[in-house]
Amino acid sequence: MNVILSVMLFSSPSCVNINSFDILIVGAGISGIVLANILANHNKRVLIVEKRDHIGGNCYDKVDSKTQLLFHQYGPHIFHTNNQTVINFISPFFELNNYHHRVGLKLKNNLDLTLPFDFQQIYKLMGKDGRKLVSFFKENFSLNTHLSLAELQLIDNPLAQKLYQFLISNVYKPYSVKMWGLPFAMINENVINRVKIVLSEQSSYFPDAIIQGLPKSGYTNSFLKMLANPLIDVQLNCKDNLLVYQDEKLFFNNNLIEKPVVYCGLIDKLFNFCFGHLQYRSLAFSWKRFNQKKYQTYPVVNMPLAKSITRSVEYKQLTNQGSFKPQTIVSFETPGSYAINDPRFNEPYYPINNTLNDTLFKKYWKKASKLKNLHLLGRLATYQYIDMDKAILLSIKKAQQLLS
């Protein structure tokens, strides 16, 4: 069911009365929306300003006008969490479908392999040697042990080394180098180790999740429910210079603002890139419609060995909507270096957390901390990759801080 947005959409910044709200939130992504919901429920008047023409940030989804299929404009978002506080918060807004994530691999040998790599994948890949290796794992490790690639490399067993060489050469290294645009040795180890090798017959992509899936009505409709409070006003299509840092003060719409400001945008941009630009990876999407019920075996298929594309995503398999329709929508993702003026790569998706960038970010963080009414929240403002459940939890904590 669609929810009507019961918030005021200002036509221009001149309509905004700086005295008409208690707290300003810059950014209508998941972090800002969750925060606004909690604050409004505590009788705070909240103004959200957003430069895009829609709410939801990168979680935004919409219905394709030609096929009537729901898709994610900025790539797939699968919700998962093991945090009860987050579960309690989303319960009135998210009714999750029963989707459990699994990622297919498209490799040269055309084997039906998936991630995470588990015993079933080892059998398919290595045959008799695979059965020997699984026996070795069962004798020497506890069932359901999750091994990182680095841990697999250290196992003194020739078949384990054979598996390691296959994974490093065909999966982890080519995918990561393409994704991050860096030599493999320079890529953050935490990034490489996000997907483990699971010592069990079956495995889950999100093994710690208590709940996982996608909202049955879509993320956008779920966010509209969160914003359905008369104390929340939203302004879309904003100029991105409404909030300005000048002379160690913040100005909103050319007026000095001393009320709390929660900023969810690029932290380096807020401070006019005074220390330099933080680096991000971006994505370019190629969208295709197919006149068939199903395009690929798995909802998400990683392509480590393809020249430029990292993965393809078939959205009807994620949303569980339109399975009967003889059409489907698939996106193909190509990563590149973020640059604001690049027509393909002008959206900052993934912070490149290395020594250089993290040192630069700390300078901006220190500068921001001197502004007593400024609060940084979300992926761009805190320069870190944040899963949706963590974004929600951080917004809950920020609300508690602002209300205390």
Curated annotation (Swiss-Prot):
It catalyses: UDP-alpha-D-galactose = UDP-alpha-D-galactofuranose. UDP-alpha-D-galactose binds at S176, W180, Y205, N302, R311, Y350, Y385. GO terms for molecular function: flavin adenine dinucleotide binding; UDP-galactopyranose mutase activity. Keywords: FAD, Flavoprotein, Isomerase. Its EC number is 5.4.99.9. FAD binds at S31, E50, K51, N58, H77, I78, R379, I386, D387, M388, D389, K390, A391. Its cofactor is FAD. The keyword Secreted does not apply. InterPro entries: FAD/NAD-bd_sf (IPR036188), UDP-GALP_mutase (IPR004379), UDP-GalPyranose_mutase_C (IPR015899). GO terms for cellular component: cytosol. PANTHER family: UDP-GALACTOPYRANOSE MUTASE. Involved in the conversion of UDP-GalP into UDP-GalF through a 2-keto intermediate. Belongs to the UDP-galactopyranose/dTDP-fucopyranose mutase family. This is UDP-galactopyranose mutase. It comes from Mycoplasma genitalium (strain ATCC 33530 / DSM 19775 / NCTC 10195 / G37).
